[in-house]
Curated annotation (Swiss-Prot):
Classification via InterPro entries: Marvel, MARVEL-CKLF_proteins
Protein name: Proteolipid protein 2
Summary of the function given for this chain in its UniProt record: May play a role in cell differentiation in the intestinal epithelium.
Compartments, record wording: Membrane
Domain MARVEL: 19-138
Record-level Gene Ontology MF annotations: chemokine binding
Gene encoding the protein: Plp2
Amino acid sequence: MADSERLSAPGCWLACTSFSRTKKGILLFAEIILCLVILICFSASTTSAYSSLSVIEMICAAVLLVFYTCDLHSKISFINWPWTDFFRSLIATILYLITSIVVLVEGRGSSRVVAGILGLLATLLFGYDAYITFPLKQQRHTAAPTDPTDGP
């Protein structure tokens, strides 16, 4: 039993780390880190009312990262994962844009201004994530036949 666990461990580790090297894995990891930094900036300000957006988006991105890393998305087939990921990133884009504009207009304190600027950066990051995960863009098309046709 110990030999089989030892032999399967590198395969499991390879499967878990292979997603983190993809564009989507790096993007999800960057979203988590950026949400954490924004959360720290909002927590350092006098009012931390806007920090809930960072917490929720960080948790959602971490859950999707775990699901994709452990290949759980292929085992749970009743959820349409591309649309789920697209709507998560689209909603985050809209909410970060609104929150950042409100915070920058209020402009009370340097940590809130930094959080607002980082929120605009998060808007771009989540918007890019929504762009690359748009499910209709990823549909495959069948190739046209290239055989010569008999004709005049």
